[in-house]
């Protein structure tokens, strides 16, 4: 399997048919999936030793991590900002033992302007980067494109942030679709997103992508909830076609409630293109 020139598919968290992370590795191998995102969305439950052993057992699996959802680097209360930074650092300490890509939602606008929010979030991510360097933690922070219009993280501000901080994004195409309330849902629109990534961050960013895909339901304010791929109008096939035509490589994490079943569906669909 040449990982340099292709997309590796995997699950957001432990597959449905596995009891824990070690059994998850067995399930992923059996299904020819090659990645798993450790879901710390409700808190960083994993110890560093466990992560090290997990990587030894799953040496062929690409592990990433999703930091807790209780993060707002634009919070009004300084204590909430400090707690958010701590949660990302805690995620990084665990991930450093088994993987590289650390996905997080940077925060909410609250009542601030986009510009003020951007500057506050940028400055707090810089603080995190300084701490990661001081602790010698070799992880890549990946701010995610977000699905709700109240959340910081449209495609343009995410790419600008990554360019200015020399980090890389997590491109969640389902969120982009939901945030646009279904407007961004065809091959040309998805291809244009990849062109934006390349224009802002260079070809290297296309060769080292971290992507989230899932069926999704949206309302007036964007994302409502994740759905199985085939229970949503999200046009995942055109996303895969755009990725293939653009010669993108990296990892694709399936966040559908059907986890490994939909991850296999994505992989098969991509391989048949």
Swiss-Prot record:
GO terms for molecular function: DNA binding; DNA-(apurinic or apyrimidinic site) endonuclease activity; phosphoric diester hydrolase activity; zinc ion binding. GO terms for biological process: base-excision repair. InterPro entries: AP_endonuc_2 (IPR001719), Xyl_isomerase-like_sf (IPR036237), Xyl_isomerase-like_TIM-brl (IPR013022). CDD domains: AP2Ec. It holds the Pfam family AP_endonuc_2. It comes from the Archaea. PANTHER family: APURINIC-APYRIMIDINIC ENDONUCLEASE (PTHR21445:SF0), ENDONUCLEASE IV ENDODEOXYRIBONUCLEASE IV (PTHR21445). This is Uncharacterized protein MJ0133. It comes from Methanocaldococcus jannaschii (strain ATCC 43067 / DSM 2661 / JAL-1 / JCM 10045 / NBRC 100440) (Methanococcus jannaschii).
């Amino acid at each position: 399997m040449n990982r340099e020139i292709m997309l590796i598919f995997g699950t957001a968290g432990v597959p449905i048919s596995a009891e824990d992370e070690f059994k998850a590795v067995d399930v992923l191998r059996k299904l020819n999936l090659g990645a798993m995102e450790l879901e710390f969305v409700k808190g960083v439950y994993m110890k560093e030793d466990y992560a090290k052993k997990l990587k030894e057992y799953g040496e062929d699996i690409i592990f990433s991590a999703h930091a807790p959802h209780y993060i707002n680097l634009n919070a009004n209360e300084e204590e909430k900002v400090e707690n958010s930074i701590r949660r990302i650092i805690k995620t990084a300490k665990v991930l450093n033992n088994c993987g590289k890509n650390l996905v997080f939602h940077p925060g909410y606008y609250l009542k601030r302007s986009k510009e003020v929010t951007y500057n506050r979030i940028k400055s707090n991510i810089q603080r995190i980067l300084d701490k990661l360097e001081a602790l010698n933690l070799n992880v890549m922070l990946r701010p995610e494109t977000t699905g709700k219009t109240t959340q910081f993280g449209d495609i343009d501000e995410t790419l600008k942030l990554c360019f200015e901080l020399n980090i890389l994004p997590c491109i969640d195409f389902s969120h982009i679709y939901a945030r646009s309330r279904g407007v961004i849902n065809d091959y040309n629109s998805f291809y244009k997103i990849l062109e934006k990534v390349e224009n802002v961050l260079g070809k290297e960013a296309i060769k080292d992508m971290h992507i989230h895909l899932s069926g999704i339901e949206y309302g007036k304010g964007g994302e409502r909830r994740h759905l199985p791929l085939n229970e949503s109008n999200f046009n995942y096939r055109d996303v895969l076609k755009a990725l293939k035509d653009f010669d993108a490589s990296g990892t694709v994490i399936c966040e559908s409630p059907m986890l490994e079943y939909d991850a296999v569906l994505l992989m098969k669909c991509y391989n048949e293109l």
